[in-house]
């Protein structure tokens, strides 16, 4: 039964509604206008921001733009994967994730206050153990594994998930992005609500970690 009374200890010792240890290291690289390394358990993503004093043609006069690129290092996973550039095309997964990151960030920024400039966020996965797309934008995943709802799936859980859901939320707890998929079975509206509730808890905790990492700058 899905509900708040579940007492489930997972293979890594976490409770069903517990995030993996999260660490955000700011100014991780020297030359980018902004950067951070985010670690969610064994998942590590390097995010770098680059600023250009111009915007794409479709952007309204006086406004800015935020876009993103996403990739995984060949040995970010247990087996080597080919770089997208070696395949001469962007993988559908990478394209989907970088659109997710761009959309999410644009929803959080006042484009008029940004001015006529473009910020490009490069998200490079150094090591992947589940949740690389949500780590790239400080969102969180939840899923149903063996009919139990779990927050923040690592790879060994994600690979067995019957239902997988990714959420990005703002400071008010409002949804910016939600992606839910039945991997092994269908899921009910009540189950979806429970997974969103778990994600809301996780996003609230991640927001506090972000603010602490920024040292009160924002």
What does each of the following model-derived ranges do?
Residues 96, 100-104, 120, 139, ...:
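Generic beta-strand or strand-like secondary-structure segments
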Residues 102, 112-128:
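Glycine- and acidic-rich phosphate- and metal-coordinating loops
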Residues 22-25, 31-34, 52-54, 107, ...:
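Glycine-rich, charged/polar anion/phosphate-binding loops
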Residues 2-39:
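Short, Gly/Pro- and small/polar-rich lid/capping loops
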Residues 28, 33-114, 175, 179-182, ...:
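Glycine-rich, flexible beta-strand/loop modules in the N-terminal catalytic cores of phosphate-handling
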Residues 86-90, 123-132:
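A short glycine/serine-rich beta->alpha loop
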Residues 7-10, 14, 85-86, 146, ...:
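Compositionally biased, non-globular sequence tracts
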